[in-house]
């Protein structure tokens, strides 16, 4: 599936979208960060107490705590930690081998789970391949770290079955911990699914709920969560500040989707192979792209599962799938798999997919179950989608009629062709070899061949659909590594113009252009207050010149191809610097070093009443303080006169930059745990740092702890006395001490717990 592209790309496999912009960059960057290859240590001890190091990533947006920024992506992933045995510069070339490993682990876990439900273990192998190469798995290569979840979940479900049916101790707790560490966001959905799974098992009488079993599962659940909570408590405290949660005033939005097409897309996603993540074949409304909406099983679709459904009554698997279908169709229930996240996703479908695999292989193994009729039914449903290609459409603007609502006819034809072709092969094999020893081998071979061919086509559609923009990705990324060595020395930020995403991660520099969902939460309040959209990326427009001075941007980086566009679009304040390593550099003539003081402040109310488009200019003139901080720190500054709230032009911005530069830190150094600075003041004053506020920061001024003040609706300041001061900001994720303590206590408890039952089992065998 990956080999043709691996060869084509010379080992540096690149796909499209998130995979190119985030996954390659994150894996390579964090490999070096964990190994301490970035910024130097900062303040390491105060009054004999050691301080944390290697906790803060400057290259992540405006700077973010590394653990919270990457725990959603890779920080707890065993696959990422395994990759640390390789050198950092190998990582872009290891993305495919790591994906292969993840698919193998997914298949192994699915096999362990499924073998309980069939007599012939070859059917478990078949089911494992159906799961590993499901439409969900192939689709989510685009996101890469979602495949980690797909790989590890079956092991937890297998461990739950082992606890229920074989009374094994320790396995479930272990896999709960692994899955929680791997991804806290997906784990929330896994907990809900396990509850549905267990309730359905009990309600059908497939397992008997006793006090002993309940206690067993409760203890192991708590123990597993305790061992795996290392990342979740800091992440939870960080997420509390994140606005991407459910709107509790949604009303009907709780119960129904706003577009009929959303329902059709959900239903079709269970029977048809998936579209490319960023390219829909049919749908023009609803939230479809990037949602991971696919529950398709390779070759057979739902034919086997539906055959099982028709043949069984009162079965737990049917109840699980039926419950999941209801959850998929009701918005608030769907979002329950993601802690009531307000954005629509279908990224939990991999769990019912595993149950569908179990239903499929049970139907295939049972000679009494009719396989052909459901296959025909699924085929007719697939054919019914042809109506999208022939339905007459009236263009309201031209008054002309046309046929079809297809957005991408070529992709639709490929998806439909694979869907119908797979069913035809499935029916042929079932009719020719069912009941013979070679049946399962023939079907397995067909599933693998189909998965390989569809995977190549699916990835190819996504890859070459963006080839016009991504063909120079490898060149830009490798050139950035050269540029990193050739940039002038110093600790400042950069900006980019029409380059590939996340260039700052390759330069190990804080960059205003950043693509990532989980940067410091205060960024998500700072930028919107300036009228800059911040959802999953930061990309302030180049015309916002004042923001570059405020955030200490010294250089802007673009490509020769985009140089003229930049010069036409940019305002004054940029001066050509040099052409280096395939990039063109411009220097900010209004650069202000990090860490400076103000003479004036404005209240948050005044700031929020000001004109949004000139707020960046205002921030170069005055510090924004909350009413509470005005009472405490207002005496060190003067409230900005009203007449100075409006003369916010480029010329006055240049003057304000000169004033800030005249009162800036004489030294500023970025460290792997925050930053340190030196400043000489003629009076007590607040020193401002354009660094995202985070509860995890502790400030030290001349070795004494000082309060960190949140200013400008998301940045930081600290009070310093008159004269020379040394300032240190040290970061440790808020809540980490508590979660670390719980984990360190839980691990030896787990060892004793497992050891006790091992000893008890041996004792029983002797007697």
Residue ranges and their predicted role:
Residues 4-154, 178-182, 265, 276-288, ...:
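Active-site lumenal/periplasmic loops and adjacent helix-entry segments of GT-C-fold
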Residues 20-41, 47-50, 214, 221, ...:
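Periplasmic/ER-lumenal interhelical loops and adjacent helix-loop junctions
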Residues 64, 68-72, 450-470, 483-553, ...:
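Extracytoplasmic/lumenal acceptor-recognition loop(s) of multi-pass membrane glycoenzymes
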Residues 98-99, 103-116, 122-164, 168-203, ...:
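Membrane-embedded helix bundles of polyisoprenyl
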Residues 106-113, 152-164, 192-200, 302-308, ...:
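Transmembrane alpha-helical segments
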Residues 167, 186, 317-476, 724-767:
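Contiguous transmembrane helix-bundle modules in multi-pass membrane proteins
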Residues 206-215, 305-328:
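Membrane-interface helix-loop-helix junctions at transmembrane boundaries of multi-pass membrane enzymes
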Residues 636-767:
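Active-site-proximal, structured, solvent-exposed surfaces of multi-pass membrane proteins
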């Amino acid at each position: 599936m990956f080999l043709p592209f691996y060869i084509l790309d010379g080992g540096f496999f690149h796909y499209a979208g998130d995979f190119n912009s985030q996954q390659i960059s994150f894996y390579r960057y964090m490999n070096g960060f964990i190994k301490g290859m970035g910024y130097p240590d900062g303040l390491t001890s105060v009054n004999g107490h050691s301080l944390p190091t290697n906790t803060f990533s400057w290259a992540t947006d405006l700077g973010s705590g590394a653990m919270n920024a990457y725990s959603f992506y890779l920080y707890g992933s065993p696959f990422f930690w395994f990759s640390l045995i390789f050198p950092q510069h190998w990582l872009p070339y290891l993305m495919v081998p790591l994906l292969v490993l993840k698919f193998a682990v997914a298949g192994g876990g699915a096999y362990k789970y499924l073998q309980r439900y069939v007599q012939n273990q070859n059917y478990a192998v078949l089911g494992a391949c159906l799961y590993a190469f499901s439409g969900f798995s192939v689709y989510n290569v685009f996101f890469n770290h979602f495949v980690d979840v797909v790989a590890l979940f079956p092991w937890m479900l297998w461990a739950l079955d082992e606890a229920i049916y074989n009374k094994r101790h320790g396995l479930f707790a272990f896999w709960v911990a692994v899955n929680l560490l791997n991804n806290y966001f997906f784990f929330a959905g896994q907990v809900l699914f396990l509850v549905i799974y267990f309730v359905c098992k009990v309600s059908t009488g497939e397992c008997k709920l006793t006090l002993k079993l309940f206690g067993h599962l409760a203890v192991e659940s708590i123990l597993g969560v305790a061992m795996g909570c290392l990342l979740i408590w800091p992440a939870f405290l960080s997420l509390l500040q994140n606005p991407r949660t459910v709107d509790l005033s949604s009303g009907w939005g709780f119960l129904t989707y706003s577009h009929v097409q959303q329902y059709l897309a959900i239903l079709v996603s269970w029977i048809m192979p998936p579209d490319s993540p960023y390219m829909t074949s049919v749908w023009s409304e609803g939230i479809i792209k990037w949602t991971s909406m696919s529950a398709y099983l390779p070759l057979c679709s739902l034919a086997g599962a539906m055959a099982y459904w028709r043949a069984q009554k009162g079965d737990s698997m049917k109840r699980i799938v039926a419950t999941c279908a209801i959850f998929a169709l009701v918005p608030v229930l769907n979002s329950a798999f993601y802690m009531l996240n307000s954005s629509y996703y279908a990224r939990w479908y991999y769990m019912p997919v595993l149950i569908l695999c179990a239903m499929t292989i049970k139907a295939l193994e049972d000679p009494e179950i009719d396989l052909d009729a459901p296959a025909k039914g699924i085929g007719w449903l697939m054919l019914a989608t042809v109506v999208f290609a022939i339905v007459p459409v009236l263009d309201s603007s031209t008054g002309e009629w046309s046929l079809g609502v297809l957005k991408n006819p070529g992709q639709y034809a490929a998806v439909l062709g694979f869907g119908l072709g797979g069913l035809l092969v499935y029916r042929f094999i079932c009719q020719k070899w069912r009941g013979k020893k070679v049946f399962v081998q023939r079907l397995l071979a067909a599933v693998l061949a189909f998965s390989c061919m569809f995977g190549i086509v699916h990835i190819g559609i996504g890859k070459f659909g963006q080839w016009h923009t991504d063909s120079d990705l490898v060149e830009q990324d490798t050139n950035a590594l050269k540029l990193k060595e050739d940039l002038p020395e110093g600790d400042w930020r950069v900006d980019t113009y029409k380059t590939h995403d996340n260039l700052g991660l390759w330069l190990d520099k804080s960059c205003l252009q950043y693509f990532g969902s989980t940067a410091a939460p205060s960024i998500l309040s700072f930028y919107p207050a300036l009228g800059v959209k911040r959802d999953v990326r930061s990309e302030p427009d180049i015309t916002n010149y004042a923001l570059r001075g405020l955030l200490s941007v010294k250089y802007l980086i673009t490509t020769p191809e985009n140089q003229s566009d930049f010069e036409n679009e940019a305002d004054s304040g940029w001066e050509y610097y040099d052409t280096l390593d395939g990039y063109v550099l411009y220097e900010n003539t209004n650069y202000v070093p990090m860490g400076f003081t103000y003479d004036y402040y404005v209240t948050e109310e005044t700031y929020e009443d000001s004109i949004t488009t000139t707020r960046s200019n205002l921030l170069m003139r005055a510090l924004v303080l909350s009413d509470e901080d005005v009472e405490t720190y207002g005496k060190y500054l003067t409230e900005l006169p009203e007449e100075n709230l409006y003369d916010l032009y480029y010329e006055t911005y240049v003057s304000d930059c000169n004033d800030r530069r005249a009162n800036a830190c004489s030294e500023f150094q970025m460290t792997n745990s925050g930053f340190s600075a030196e400043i000489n003041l003629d009076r007590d004053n607040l020193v401002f740092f354009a660094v995202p506020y985070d509860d995890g920061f502790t400030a030290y001024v001349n070795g004494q702890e000082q309060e960190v003040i949140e200013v400008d609706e998301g940045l930081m300041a600290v009070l310093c006395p008159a004269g020379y001061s040394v300032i240190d900001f040290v970061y440790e994720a808020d809540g980490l001490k508590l979660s670390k303590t719980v984990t360190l206590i839980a691990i030896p408890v787990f060892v004793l717990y497992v050891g006790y039952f091992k000893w008890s089992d041996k004792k029983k065998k002797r007697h």
